[in-house]
A protein has these predicted regions:
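Glycine-rich phosphate-binding loop
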Residues: 1
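Membrane-embedded and juxtamembrane structural elements of multi-pass membrane proteins
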Residues: 4-8, 20-239
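Intrinsically disordered, low-complexity proline-rich regions
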Residues: 10-16
Length: 239
């Protein structure tokens, strides 16, 4: 019949070929490569920190000397003033140009070997109060945590920016805490101490110091802060 003729004349439609499925942009191989890159960067950063720490320890082993009686008396008076019963080890060290607090679980205070020749008793007391305030605020532990974060998140510029800004805030907070109890004359003495220490070169990176930055704008900012009305009472301002 007509139906049979129509069926015989109707073109046979062949099935369309299956479209190729899109290839994934992010494959297991690329994920493995990124993980390997992250681990390599983390290992490199950790190695750099360990190298710096070992270099500091070697320098301390060969260049540290006991402090003199004058410095020790001023240090004892500062500890008593700040209510610090457990005194940190205090050593003089050649090769550094600013008082500094080492970073880690067992901190110690390092003083330049010629500090008694460059600072007055009042200026030396200001410098020691600053480092002891770092210790009271546990800044050495915060600094250790920041270093660990830069190991894990070495690829993230926000972490590095946060570390830089927190370090600035740690110094500003210490300045504020030390100068809060000082009168105008004593604050000027503290500012003169900052300027005297900022004029020296900086070569040590594994410590927290009163004037370890070599930037003039940091010196100006902190000297202005000494005479500012705002006093930060928090250990550090968070971004």
């Amino acid at each position: 019949g007509l139906g049979d003729v129509y069926k015989r004349q109707a073109p046979v439609q062949e099935p369309l070929p299956a479209a190729d499925s899109p290839k994934p942009v992010f494959t297991i191989a690329s994920a493995d490569a990124l993980i390997a890159l992250w681990v390599a960067g983390m290992a490199f950063r950790a190695a750099a920190l360990l190298f710096g720490e070992r270099r500091l320890r070697l320098a301390m082993a060969h260049n540290t000397l006991p402090t003199d009686a004058r410095t020790r008396d001023i240090y004892d008076a500062c500890c008593a003033e700040l209510g610090i019963a457990h005194k940190l080890p205090l050593q003089s060290m050649a090769g550094i140009y600013s008082p500094a607090l080492t970073v880690g679980l067992k901190p110690m205070i390092l003083l330049p070997a010629n500090i008694t020749d460059t600072l007055t008793d009042a200026q030396l007391a200001c410098a020691l109060r600053h480092e002891l305030t770092h210790y009271r605020r546990r800044d050495h532990l915060l600094m250790l945590l920041l270093r660990l974060l830069t190991c894990v998140y070495w690829f993230n510029p926000i972490v590095w920016l946060m570390k830089r800004e927190l370090m600035k805030d740690m110094e500003t907070a210490c300045d504020s805490a030390v100068t809060a109890r000082l009168n105008g004359t004593e604050r000027r003495e503290y500012a003169m101490t900052l300027l005297a220490l900022f004029s020296q070169p900086c070569r040590v990176n594994s410590v927290l110091g009163m004037a370890l930055s070599s930037a003039e704008k940091d010196a100006e900012r902190r000297v202005r802060g000494v005479f500012g009305a705002h006093r930060s009472k928090a250990p550090v301002k968070i971004l």
